Amino acid sequence: KDNNIIGGMAETWEVSDDGLTYTFHLRDGLKFYNGDAVTAEDILYSLNRAIDPEKSIFAGFLTAIAGIECPDDTTVVVTLKAPTPDFLSNFTMPCCAIVQKDSGESGDYKDLVTCGPYYIADWVKDQYMLFKKNPNYYDPSKAVTDEIKVTVAADDSTRLMEFQNGDIDLMMSTPRNNLPQLSADSNYKVEAFDTVTVNYIGFNVEAEAVSSKEVRQALAYATNVDDLIVGANQGYAQRVTTFTDNLDVLRNTGLEGYTHDVEKAKSLLADAGYADGLTLTLSITSGNTTEAQIAAILKEQWAQAGVTLEVTQYDAATLTAMKKNGEYQVGLTNLGRTGPDSALALSFIVYNPITNGMYTGWQNDECESLYLASCSELDVEKRAEMWARMQEIELDEAPLIPTYVNQDVYAMHSNVSGVQYNLFLGILPYTMQKTV
């Protein structure tokens, strides 16, 4: 809450002087939604599953854990291999949620027995998930709405049509170009929330045309971010000057980023051997109106610097595979942190082995050394200095051009109220209500 970690199942916790042992004290009387008590066996199963690379795709983010013990049903002791400044933040990830051991081992996630404010009552893949209130949750105020159904829409047009037809009460990922129309309609209301999700223009640095940092810098100078904020986001965004969000305590506040300078862009392109122009291909997600608008704006902006931008569209799965395989030149991407400490998310950029530099192919020895050193640096100022330097390096190399932090904008019918938002989890449905 408010960029801070607060207790949930754990009421209190303490950290040993050497930073290696975290002891969590759980609330008494915790129960799963089916009424069964939460036991030490369930806790050990759930947490060991989270750190097992054979069972959890998030295990790589919890490698600092050396062992987990539960002396009793209300005490959890986590021992680390080395002092880890972002451990507590990473330990709040959803993969560490506690489930009943028997239901987890069954492998049928439709029948997963959980202990949060809601549980999955029904799930049809690619269609919807139905959540119902947990009658045994320790804090009833966290579950006001009896039932929540989350539906999946194939594209922006389908989502908008279902919303206007009254099939859904609240629309996530509201198409930006429809916001003025929806805001002006008294049947609806629009609410915007600040986020920690940074948007980027990304380059495959192994593609010859953008392998030179001078070319990537030129494209950064050719980009007018303010136009992207207004033209593609209806103003629901804030410019960023580095690869992390504006609320991040690790942000290098001394960096001004790239300013819009067409002549500088032309000069850099000429230095890189493209004085007569350059043709590039931008790959975007089909059916995504915001990406289509960004592409149109970039096409016009980059043309002023002598760059011809061709745009191709692919479905999300195909495009993701292309990026992983390095089969693209220019793309659009974003990254949001999962907790108050941003190091886990930002490691995707600066530490190549994790995601191949956010699928850019970028690798920098100094960045990787700084990142590895920062993982065990408990001195706040020294750690911040390491991250400040990493941001300087990335901004100069420009495998990703940071553009803006967008706001999450939700359109809802006028009879919906009580919407809350969490910086790291997004919308919280706990207190949503609908009047008839």
Describe every region a protein language model picked out.
Residues 1-17, 93-116, 120-122, 136-145, ...:
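Short, solvent-exposed loop/beta-turn-alpha elements that line the ligand-binding surface or hinge
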Residues 11-55, 71, 77, 209-211:
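Aromatic- and charge-enriched surface segment that lines or borders ligand/interaction sites
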Residues 14, 18, 25, 60-101:
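Surface-exposed binding/hinge segments that line
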Residues 35-37, 157-167, 184-185, 213-214, ...:
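Short helices/loops that flank or line small-molecule/ion binding pockets
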Residues 39-46, 73-79, 116-117, 145-147, ...:
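Alpha-helical secondary-structure segments
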Residues 132-133, 191, 211-300, 389, ...:
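Append "and occasionally in soluble cytosolic enzymes with long acidic Gly/Pro-rich linkers
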Residues 136-181, 308:
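Ligand-site clamp/hinge motif
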Residues 270-338, 408:
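Ligand/substrate-recognition segments at binding pockets and active sites
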